[in-house]
């Protein structure tokens, strides 16, 4: 078992922080895959580092956890993302990343044939938490992107609502976006707050109970 696998096992069933658990190494760019070959990677970029612009035949969805990162390309294309912001990069044109202060972000590979919600436009900065509204006494759900290897969903829970115990068909990460909730996992309750993450193992029984208004993104790997 390599160190990466060991870290994934440590975070299973626990509240953790992608940003705090992957601090940048001075002068370096570091990448760490999640869930094997599902196209989900945690990146840590030290200040004044960059990933050279290259052409990719697929989109990249970035979810920034810490710091800020500039996504840049040809013809003056440039978008700066801060913690809590996301972008879907364009395809078939050079795209690179650079940072002056350092950044930690999650990158999700999104194939062209993936089913994407029409609200998402390539090259535009957005916040996942802004995609869905709260509804009184309701749980509001939006599929953001879906392909054979992963699915990203954003959910808004009114205070007191939740999801009863169920199991995920693959490994999954929760991104807490707003508010607070209690995650029940294999009989243990844990509080999760905005800015934190939670790691479900495949088949792990879990539930969600919003103790306050709560928004989260669920990134699910599929077998």
Language-model features: locations:
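Short acidic-glycine-tyrosine-enriched beta hairpin
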Residues: 75-92, 186-203
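Conserved small-residue-rich
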Residues: 119-180, 186-187
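A cytosolic small-molecule/anion-sensing beta-strand core signal
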Residues: 65-66, 82, 101, 177-178, ...
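A short, N-terminal "cap"/entry segment at the start of jelly-roll beta-barrel domains
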Residues: 1-39, 82-83, 102-104, 109-149
């Amino acid at each position: 078992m390599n160190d990466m696998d060991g870290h994934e096992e440590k975070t299973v069933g626990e509240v953790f922080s992608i940003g705090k658990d992957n601090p940048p190494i001075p002068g370096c760019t570091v990448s760490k895959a999640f869930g094997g070959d599902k196209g989900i990677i945690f990146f840590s970029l030290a200040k004044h580092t960059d990933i050279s612009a290259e052409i990719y035949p697929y989109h990249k969805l970035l979810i920034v956890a810490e710091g800020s990162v500039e996504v840049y390309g040809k013809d003056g294309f440039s978008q700066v993302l801060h913690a809590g912001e996301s972008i879907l990069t364009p395809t078939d044109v050079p795209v690179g990343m650079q940072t002056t202060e350092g950044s930690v972000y999650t990158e999700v590979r999104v194939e062209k044939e993936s089913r994407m919600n029409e609200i998402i436009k390539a090259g535009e900065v957005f916040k996942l938490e802004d995609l869905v509204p709260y509804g009184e006494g309701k749980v509001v759900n939006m599929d953001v992107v879906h392909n054979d290897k992963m699915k990203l969903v954003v959910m808004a829970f009114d205070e007191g609502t939740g999801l009863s115990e169920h199991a995920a068909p693959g490994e999954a990460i929760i991104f807490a976006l707003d508010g607070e909730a209690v995650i029940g996992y294999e009989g243990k309750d844990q509080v999760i707050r905005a800015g934190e993450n939670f790691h479900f193992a495949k088949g792990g029984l879990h539930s969600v109970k919003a103790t306050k208004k709560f928004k989260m993104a669920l990134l699910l790997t599929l077998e």
